[in-house]
Amino acid sequence: MPLDPRKLSSFILILLAIGSYASLQIGHVKIDFFAAIISPLYGEATPDAIILWDLRMPRTLMCLIVGFGLGMAGAGLQGFLRNPLAEPSVVGISSAAALGAVLSIGLGFSAFGLYYTPAFSLGFAAVASWALIKLTSRAVNKHSVILIGVGISSLSGAFTTLMLSLSENPFAINEIVFWMLGSVTDVSYHHVLMSAPLVTLGSFFLLRAANGLDLLTLGEETAASIGANIPKLRRDILIGTALTVGSITSVVGIVGFVGLVTPHIVRPFVKHEPGKTLIWTPPIAALLVLISDITIRLLPTASEIKLGVLTALLGTPFFLYLVSKQRD
């Protein structure tokens, strides 16, 4: 059922505001929220203000960035590949980005500067994206895309496990496990400022592909005959996905299934148009990541469950449902 864009945008903004407030308010320590908000105005560094501004605020912002970027990348991949099962983690891009980060840590490059790990992650995400799009152009059918993605993911996972096995540095092992699980627990404003510009730039490339994705529903040959620039469309999706997924994974690790599930939630409300799905998926995905992170904080566990673990637990049944639906 399609909705009025203004009503939909207003509704989503309200939900995001409520979710952000809940994320700032909810935690293991109860704080006086409004006192913490105004404390910096008086130059006071109260415990509540430190918890709010130094811990929960960057965590909330990172949740929004993670959801926004992964949601847009997932919608872009599904629209371009015309495959509802496509998603950065499913097609191997997230695993490749994590491998880049793991290699940077395991080989000691991360010790030379703060930007080596993101650079490695972005580079590997770009290579995986290029390989996926290149091999997809020769695929016999759309299901071959998933098989190719499984191959990329398996290869990346194998090298990641190899690095974990060969590493003799316990600190490096802990970091590698962090990338494999995905978490926003220890993020800071530095991580937010490092990932936000790249996600924004990647989103620019993906949004440029919105009109082309609509034309692509007519078929590649028909779309090209009426003005769609298929090579440019492929390049925009490639660069956009690599930038968004690579920058996010370089900071928080692998957070899967966000980009898979959210486009399916949005699609019925936008008449199943790929371009509109690409536009409306990011804020909904950001909301889902916020809710997931809030759920993690509410669970009565000795230590917090990693965000990537929870999204995988919630997303895997949905993925299996989609696979069974495709077979039917």
Residue ranges and their predicted role:
Residues 1-328:
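Alpha-helical transmembrane segments in inner-membrane proteins
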